[in-house]
């Protein structure tokens, strides 16, 4: 399954489903914990395993076998774990949670263990890794946006808006921008500047977008860094051109929350997850869904899709 084009989804029905992206067929269903929805999913860089997080749990599943139970349960996790992701070589994983901490997990050791911790002094809703593989962007419920250098332990902190909770953060693949979206429908963008004599990137305020009328749930940059995506509780996923941050497209799933999304490697297609329990594949040029992935019985709150292997083969 490692080289297949697969989509993984998870949500409020306590299951994680693995789909053939090109057919819409569900090829595997894995049980999550009965006490939590799935908050985030990420596939390991070698594409053999899938990590999932939720309330007081982080689990790692094997995609190569028929086993539907997790192969690793991470110990000692408190409160809600909101985000996770992998360093590009798979040597470590980061997680963010409502225990106020962003943690670095050593994935080479057996079993994996927490090797480093950053205290945000407030529940952490979001975290993302800079393409330089050294800095992590973070957003907290008290409105702070952090940039943390994992190696030097230095960090920068900005509060873009008072009395607003940061719901998601994203860093563009070219490393030029950091975006943070909040519960008031606003998305803030900073230019990331660095020079040889600097220890870490600095954040320069660049743009504020009044992106949605309601809660923003996710923000993500396209792989080519030309688009910024925001998804919301207002039933839309909006795409903004990073050249001037003007709106380019609006995808509508009326009356439902759009919880998560993922781009294809060529930045021409988008997967969305929504509260109607359906994942959709959209062709961005036409603004229309071309495929639906149905099988979840409740809202889908997280998805993961990576097709870099196919892209490399084609090139």
Curated annotation (Swiss-Prot):
WD repeat coordinates: 1-31, 33-71, 76-115, 119-158, 161-200, 211-250, 253-292, 295-315
Record flagged with keyword DNA damage: no
GO biological process per UniProt: regulation of actin cytoskeleton organization; TOR signaling
SUPFAM superfamilies with a match to the protein in the record: WD40 repeat-like
Keyword Cell inner membrane: no
Subcellular location field: Cytoplasm
Keyword vocabulary terms for this entry: Cytoplasm, Repeat, WD repeat
Pfam families linked to this entry: WD40
Family: Belongs to the WD repeat LST8 family.
Protein name per its UniProtKB record: Protein LST8 homolog
Organism of provenance: Drosophila pseudoobscura pseudoobscura
């Amino acid at each position: 399954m490692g080289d297949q084009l697969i989509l993984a989804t998870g949500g409020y029905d306590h299951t994680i489903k693995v789909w053939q992206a090109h057919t819409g067929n569900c090829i595997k269903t894995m049980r999550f914990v009965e006490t939590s929805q799935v908050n985030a999913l990420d596939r390991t860089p070698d594409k053999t395993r899938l990590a999932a997080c939720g309330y007081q749990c982080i689990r790692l599943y094997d995609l190569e076998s028929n086993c539907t139970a997790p192969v690793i349960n991470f110990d000692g996790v408190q409160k809600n774990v909101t985000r996770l992701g992998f360093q590009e070589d798979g040597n470590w994983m980061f997680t963010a949670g409502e225990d106020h901490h962003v943690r670095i997990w050593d994935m080479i050791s057996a079993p994996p263990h927490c090797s480093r911790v950053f205290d945000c002094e407030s529940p952490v809703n979001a975290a993302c890794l800079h393409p330089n593989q050294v800095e992590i962007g973070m957003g907290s419920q008290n409105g702070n946006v952090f940039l943390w250098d994992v190696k030097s332990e230095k960090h920068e902190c900005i509060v873009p808006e008072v009395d607003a909770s940061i719901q998601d953060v994203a860093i563009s693949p070219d490393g030029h921008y950091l975006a943070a979206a909040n519960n008031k429908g606003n998305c803030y963008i900073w230019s990331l500047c660095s020079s040889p004599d600097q220890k870490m990137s600095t954040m320069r305020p660049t743009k504020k977008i009044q992106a949605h009328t309601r809660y923003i749930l996710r923000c993500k940059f396209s792989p080519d860094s030309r688009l910024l995506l925001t998804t919301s509780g207002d039933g839309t996923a909006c795409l903004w051109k990073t050249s001037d941050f003007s709106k380019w497209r609006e995808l509508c799933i009326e009356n439902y929350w759009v919880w998560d999304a993922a781009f294809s490697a060529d930045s021409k297609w988008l997967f969305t997850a929504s509260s109607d329990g359906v994942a959709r594949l959209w062709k961005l040029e036409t603004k229309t869904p071309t495929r639906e992935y149905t099988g979840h019985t409740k809202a889908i709150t997280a998805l993961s899709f990576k097709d870099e292997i196919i892209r490399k083969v084609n090139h």
